[in-house]
Amino acid sequence: MYSKVFSLISKYNLKPNSDLGQNFLIVGDVIKREVERAEIKNSETILEIGPGLGVLTDELAKRAGKVYAIEKDSRIIEILKKEYNWSNVEIMQGDALKIKFPEFNKVVSNLPYQISSPITFKLLKYDFERAVLIYQLEFAQRMVAKPGDKNYSRLSVMVQAKVNVDLVERIGRGAFYPKPKVDSAVIVMEPKPKDEQIELNENLVKALFQHRRKLASKALKDSYHMLGLTREDFKKFKPIIERVPHSNKRVFQLSIEDIKDIEEFLRNESLID
């Protein structure tokens, strides 16, 4: 993998674009493990976001029935089309945050770090069986954090409300070219059964975690505008907010179920839709 990536960089005089988060994975064993964790069948369709120079794409193409690879950089697309002769790979040019994803079973990607958050929230709106994704380590740690942890955040809540998530491998920065400033990690996500998924009001979760170390009721009072309340509304509803369930807990201690309790209370009191 190392020699393949560097031969292509040399051949095409390619300068990785830091604005697009181009840090190419160059360690074959890491790529092999990422593909193995996806447990790909030849009948399945795989989505890859940011194929880079195609080394992961090539391994996916050997196993899957179909691979959709979304790439924003026209230079990279030209290289992929010249260097590979895939019959089951469709390269889609565009911004992964803006285009509608095709139907897919699984998603396997070394994600551009600067779109980690929005692309994760977008993926959670799609039906898939498994996701094997490489993230910046700190972001991955937030995804798996539990109530009370220092990394527990809005991201932790919104992800774990929908999927089972595991951090399965830490990757040193030397596994990439150019070498990033931070380590990375492999995350595996599998959606929970529909009856176990919890739908949460995103504005409420944002309002709470805007002040993650404050008591739940105080956090909501300080972020009332994020709930769509005017100052006059807030004066009217302040006594109700003070009575929210779990008001004696700090936000970073709230479980997903606790947050759902707060949401249902506020909805019953007509504070949120």
From Swiss-Prot:
Its EC number is 2.1.1.-. The gene is rsmA. It comes from the Archaea. Keywords: Cytoplasm, Methyltransferase, RNA-binding, rRNA processing, S-adenosyl-L-methionine, Transferase. It is an enzyme of class 2 (transferase). It is found in: Cytoplasm. Belongs to the class I-like SAM-binding methyltransferase superfamily. rRNA adenine N(6)-methyltransferase family. RsmA subfamily. One of its GO terms (molecular function) is rRNA (adenine-N6,N6-)-dimethyltransferase activity. SMART domains: rADc. GO terms for cellular component: cytoplasm. This is Probable ribosomal RNA small subunit methyltransferase A. Specifically dimethylates two adjacent adenosines in the loop of a conserved hairpin near the 3'-end of 16S rRNA in the 30S particle. May play a critical role in biogenesis of 30S subunits. Its main location: cytoplasm. It holds the Pfam family RrnaAD.
